[in-house]
Amino acid sequence: MDNILKASNMEGTSTMTVTSRSSEDSSCISNHEQDTDTHKDGDTSGLENSKISKRKWMKEFFKLSKSPASKSSRSIGSMKSNQSLVSMKSSDDGNSYKNDYSSICGNSLPSAGLSRSNSVKELKLDSTGSQRSKNNVAMLARSSTTSQTTCSSSSSSSSYNSIKGNENDILLQNNNHFRHNKEIPQSKGSSNINTASIMSQYNVDTQATAIMSDMQKQYDSQQMTSPFVNEDLHFDPNGEVSHVIKAIFKEIGYKYDDFSDIPVFQLMQEMYQLVKKNSSARRTKITDYASKLKEKEAQLKSQNDKILKLETTNKAYKTKYKEVSLENKKIKEAFKELDNESYNHDEELLKKYKYTRETLDRVNREQQLIIDQNEFLKKSVNELQNEVNATNFKFSLFKEKYAKLADSITELNTSTKKREALGENLTFECNELKEICLKYKKNIENISNTNKNLQNSFKNERKKVLDLRNERNLLKKEILLIECHGSYSLLLVSNILTCYRFLLPSDTIIETESLIKELLNMNNSLSNHVSSSDEPPAEYSKRLELKCVEFEEKLLYFYQELVTKKIIDVIYKCFINYYKKSRQTDQKSNQNSSTPYKQSQRQVPHSIK
């Protein structure tokens, strides 16, 4: 009897977990089927994901069905904690499901504790959400009331950093729980939120408010004439900053036609109020989006944790089902023994009988859930059968293609034999061509060697030619220097003739002038003859030698006989005679001078003049 009481207590705890698990399994299955039905028409990737999830679920179910029954010595406290966690399941939209323990277990089982825990947690969530919203509203009120640009910029940067941090946390959690989130359909509201675009608009508004508040402060503090304001405190449309102000108006959304008639202070106030409204509205939107994102994060975390716990409870459910079936058999055997024996405790038997009836009803309900699961598995098996039929049809098509390919392979074999015969002929011809190519290669190598030798000889000859050219250029330069020296020496002789013409006879003067002209002409003809190299080298060398000999003879005659003997010697003699006469005249003048301080004037003879 003690064993029967222990079994009954174990049955009570196990059936509570089983019923809660079965109800949540059925709700999860129904929700999953609804989500898959809604996404079938819209997206083909949803079908593939649903099939993969079904197959995974089937594999896990068969593994659990094949696994051995767990021992009955498992702790009741862990089962109760799983039961309380299973009871707290919330949907994707934020609505929480009610506990079904009272409807399943009846009035005899205490389910008030579970419902209380659920309600308390919901109140905690609501209180935290309200506190966050209050804090966000307070921050927005502070940022809107203050007129300083530093406060607005700091609040915008802090809110932007908080939102970016939340987004990074969501991305990390999605990456960590990617395996579990594949089967859960995501909400459409979270995917449509473009936080980057909202924050860019918000930054533009904060910058505009900062600019306008700075301009207003400068205007109130200084009240000085500016390059874009008239004397009547109106904007100058032809000023320096008018196009900048128009661009700011367009960014803010302020409509203007002609702002030359509006005072500056009034226009600034209107723009400031408009920017205030836009920035406050956008800040409220940002805070709403941040709160929604945090709620979605909490929902995803709770759902992922619940899925893991549901998997563990499913395993426990199967093991407990086997234990309950064994205990049911024991109870039936005990009832048979009690019928045979004479037992007077009728009240206890009635209570136990009622308890066993309740357990049997629960077992029947569990069997119905298993039947529903079997129907779901049958549907999946039918789908798999359809896939098998489709693959068989594809296999038949592949067979037909294989037959066609076999025919084409036979044709290819015949064609390959023909090509092999042609290939043998081509190989024979190729061998002949290779021999010819070897001969040509040897000839080419010989030619290349001779070409290299010719190139080397050509380079040597070219170097010689370049050396000769350099020598020729040097000779030309020397000839030019000699010509220059000769021409200047002839000019010197002609200058001497002009200076001492009165001392020389006319025959020598005429002869020297004619020789100077001839020598100059010969010098020019030699230079021209050297520069022109169109004649053959033998004739060119002969003509040069003849001209050089003539030129040398005339030069010797000119300098040795004419210049030295007929000109320089005559001038030298005249100079000596003049010097002697001048000495004699000096002596006479010194003797005849009467005054000591009177200088003697030397008279130059008329012949020297």
UniProtKB/Swiss-Prot annotation:
Cellular location(s): Prospore membrane; Cytoplasm, Cytoskeleton, Spindle pole
Main location: membrane
Compositional bias per record (Polar residues), positions renumbered to this chain: 10-31, 82-96, 127-136, 587-609
Coiled-coil ranges per UniProt: 283-342, 357-393, 424-483
Residue ranges, compositional bias (Low complexity): 68-81, 143-159
GO-annotated cellular components: cytoplasm; meiotic spindle pole body; prospore membrane; spindle pole; spindle pole body
Single Gene Ontology BP annotation: cell division
Region called Disordered, residue ranges: 1-50, 68-96, 124-165, 586-609
UniProt keywords, alphabetically: Cell cycle, Cell division, Coiled coil, Cytoplasm, Cytoskeleton, Meiosis, Membrane, Sporulation
Role according to the record: Involved in the pathway that organizes the shaping and sizing of the prospore membrane (PSM) during sporulation. May provide a meiosis-specific scaffold for the assembly of other proteins on spindle pole bodies (SPBs), and may be a limiting component for SPB formation.
Entry similarity comment: Belongs to the MPC70 family.
Record text on subunit structure and interactions: Interacts directly with MPC54, NUD1 and SPC42. Interacts with ADY3. Interacts with ADY4. Probable component of a SPB complex composed of ADY3, SSP1, DON1, MPC54, SPO21/MPC70, NUD1 and CNM67.
UniProt-recorded name of the protein: Sporulation-specific protein 21
Species, as recorded: Saccharomyces cerevisiae (strain ATCC 204508 / S288c)
